[in-house]
A protein has these predicted regions:
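Short low-complexity stretches enriched in small and charged residues
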Residues: 11-16, 47-56, 130-135, 151-153, ...
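Long, contiguous hydrophobic alpha-helical segments, chiefly transmembrane helices and signal peptides
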Residues: 21-25, 128, 208
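N-terminal short leaders/motifs
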Residues: 27-48, 143-177
Length: 209
């Protein structure tokens, strides 16, 4: 966390905008008047960036897709639940977290559809915040690992890369496809001036774009 806070402080000095491409939090759910305990310094740093005139956008990832009005109204973050196409530094960019893209992992796709459904969100909101937050944190907890990427991460990386290359081929107006989710950084020039980039992760690689 301290390294991330130092990086945010540096960002405040030199960035014109900041886009966080999902899974900033291991678990996030906003009840009507309660948010998960913790993340205080990170949230304060993000609010500080916004107060200094640096726009902050956050793409919901598979761990923190349930963002809402606390992030947007109290912190000032623009929260996005779905992929977007935007002009970034002269590049027409497709920006997505990356979960659910590519072939395979049918079980996760089904779970993702259920978890993102309105009924699931409503039902989860009926749980007591202490129980709901503990349950969500337990299910979505990211384990710190030693060594290289796991087989599952390599599989996700391959699937998302294959999807991204196909998307660049399908839409010639795109210059850049940016994803996360896989935890494996990657920069690939598909053809002159057109790229697929995976920002990797902060926990293991301290990587960013």
């Amino acid at each position: 966390e301290q390294a991330f806070l130092r990086w945010l402080a540096h960002t405040a000095e030199c960035a014109s905008a900041l886009i966080l491409n999902g899974d900033v939090f291991d678990f996030w759910f906003e009840y009507r008047s309660v948010v998960p305990r913790g993340h205080t310094r990170v949230l304060g740093a993000l609010a500080g960036l916004v107060d200094r005139g640096v726009p902050v956008s956050m793409m919901g990832g598979n761990h923190d897709w349930w963002g809402g009005s606390f992030l947007t109204e109290e912190i000032g973050v623009t929260f996005m639940q779905d992929p977007v196409v935007a002009e970034l530094q002269g590049f027409r960019t497709f920006l997505a977290h990356g979960d659910g893209l590519g072939r395979g992992d049918l079980g996760y796709r089904i779970l993702r559809a259920v978890v993102r459904g309105r009924l699931t969100r409503w039902l989860f909101g009926r749980l007591h915040p202490d129980f709901g937050t503990a349950l969500g944190a337990r299910v979505s907890r990211t384990e710190y690992r030693e060594g290289g990427p796991s087989d599952a991460e390599r599989g996700r990386s391959k699937a998302v890369r294959t999807w991204a290359l196909a998307e660049l081929q399908r839409d010639p107006s795109l210059d850049l496809v940016v994803c996360g989710h896989t935890h494996i950084p990657l920069l690939e020039e598909v053809e002159p001036g057109r790229y697929y980039v995976n920002a990797g992760d902060w926990l293991h690689h301290r990587s960013y774009l």
